[in-house]
Amino acid sequence: AALALTLVLPGLAAYEMPIQTVNEGESVYLFNADIDKPILEQNADQQRYIASLTKMMTALLFLESGKDMNAEITIPASLTQEFKDIQNANGSTINLRIGETVRRIDLLYGLLVASANDAASVIASDVSDGDLTAFVARMNQRAKELGCTSTSFTCVHGLYDYGNVSSAHDL
């Protein structure tokens, strides 16, 4: 019984306690699904650079693509310049190489666990038949379908492109 009270009481206390706001310039959107309303909003619709959160949309589209996650693919030569750009930016990678064969599921793990920018590019290329621009367009379309009105993508990984933005409310 003591354990049950320990688990329940903090949750009840959260409903009773006033919620302090965060620093004035920060964004927050805290939604309580139990009561179906936001319990804290501050600059919730302000667009912010989202960096590697971009990879969540890349992962979503990969999973929705219906591709066999256990199948192996070969990393295409068309990604040579993309890989050079990623390497020059000194971001996270799993050191994929052009011509290497890799399972799709391993790309997904690299994307989500290591935040690997090279994995994001290979995934996008795989899903869009080599057209990263088309993949980015699909990312933006999917964001709109999800009701994300403050979200805009301009690259598949969020590494060096300041055009990838979203808001606390959208996220």
Where are these regions (language model features)?
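Active-site-adjacent loops and short helices of periplasmic peptidoglycan-processing enzymes
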Residues: 13-169
